[in-house]
């Protein structure tokens, strides 16, 4: 009888020590349970010690199998926090919502017109553009009187994405922007194609890597109807080619209603 009592005491001590050792595990602490609680102690024999240990292992594995949840990339603060104050000032200055802010940052990172950027971003300059071609920072642009236009499906093409901004030159301020389709005739033949992203519709796929409407400044009708669009020598795509621009805000609205 004494031997059985001594054996039970030894088993109790061993279980208590092992419980305290596992209780110090960080993952066990995160689970919010305590091994030293009276409900988890059953010092009545060897048969109770084994299932108690397996139960503890199961709980421990469950706590380990739950990875930390990363910050969601769709959060606007994620993008703004990684873009720095310059990107934040540019986005807030444009009055963008969260979705437009993300699209703007995508376009900034790709250094070109992004297929996800469904709205044209254009700074209408009230001052002459810089002679050296270097784009000022957004705060300097706002201080110089630049206005920002977001125009439907349209894109601006004479871009310098190093500052994450797009600018239309002052010399053709009457041009609201440059149309996106690869050619004006493709817009007439396939109405609605101008609103497609990526290659700019069927015409863009035919022209390969040139998704904008390049034109010839020496040919007045190279953009189609000269009353609606004309070839601008001041607005160029990222290949340095002149592109077609609307002659006024009124004609820009007409082109947009026509499906450009």
Curated annotation (Swiss-Prot):
Biased composition (Polar residues): 33-68
GO cellular component: extracellular region
UniProt protein name: Methionine-rich nacre protein
KW rRNA processing (keyword) present: no
Signal peptide (from-to): 1-19
Region called Disordered, residue ranges: 23-75
Compartment(s): Secreted
Reported tissue expression: Expressed in mantle distal zone, mantle margin and grafted pearl pockets. Not expressed in adductor muscle, gills, hemocytes or ungrafted pearl pockets. Within the mantle, specifically expressed in mineralizing outer epithelium cells (at protein level). After secretion incorporated into acid-insoluble nacre matrix of shell and pearl (at protein level). Not found in acid-insoluble matrix of shell prisms (at protein level).
Main location: secreted
Keywords: Secreted, Signal
């Amino acid at each position: 009888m004494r031997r059985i009592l001594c054996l039970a005491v030894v088993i109790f001590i061993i279980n208590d020590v092992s419980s305290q050792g596992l209780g110090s595990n960080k993952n066990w602490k995160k689970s919010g349970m305590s091994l030293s609680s009276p409900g988890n102690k059953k010092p009545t024999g060897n048969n109770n010690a084994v299932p108690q240990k397996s139960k503890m292992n199961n709980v421990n594995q469950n706590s380990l199998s739950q990875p930390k949840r990363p910050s969601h990339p769709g959060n606007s603060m994620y993008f703004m926090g990684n873009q720095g104050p310059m990107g934040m000032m540019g986005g807030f200055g444009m009055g963008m919502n969260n979705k437009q802010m993300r699209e703007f940052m995508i376009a900034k990172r790709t250094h070109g017109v992004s297929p996800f950027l469904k709205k044209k971003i254009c700074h209408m300059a009230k001052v002459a553009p810089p002679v050296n071609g270097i784009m000022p920072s957004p705060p300097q642009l706002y201080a110089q009187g630049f206005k920002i236009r977001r125009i439907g499906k349209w894109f601006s093409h004479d871009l310098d994405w190093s500052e994450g901004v797009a600018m239309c030159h002052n010399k053709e301020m009457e041009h609201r922007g440059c149309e996106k389709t690869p050619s004006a005739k493709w817009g007439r033949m396939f109405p609605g194609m101008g609103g497609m992203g990526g290659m700019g519709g069927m015409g863009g796929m035919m022209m390969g890597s040139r998704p904008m409407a390049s034109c010839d400044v020496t040919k007045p009708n190279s953009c189609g109807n000269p009353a609606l669009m004309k070839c601008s020598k001041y607005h160029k795509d990222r290949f340095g080619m002149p592109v077609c621009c609307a002659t006024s805000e009124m004609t820009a609205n007409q082109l947009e209603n026509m499906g450009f």
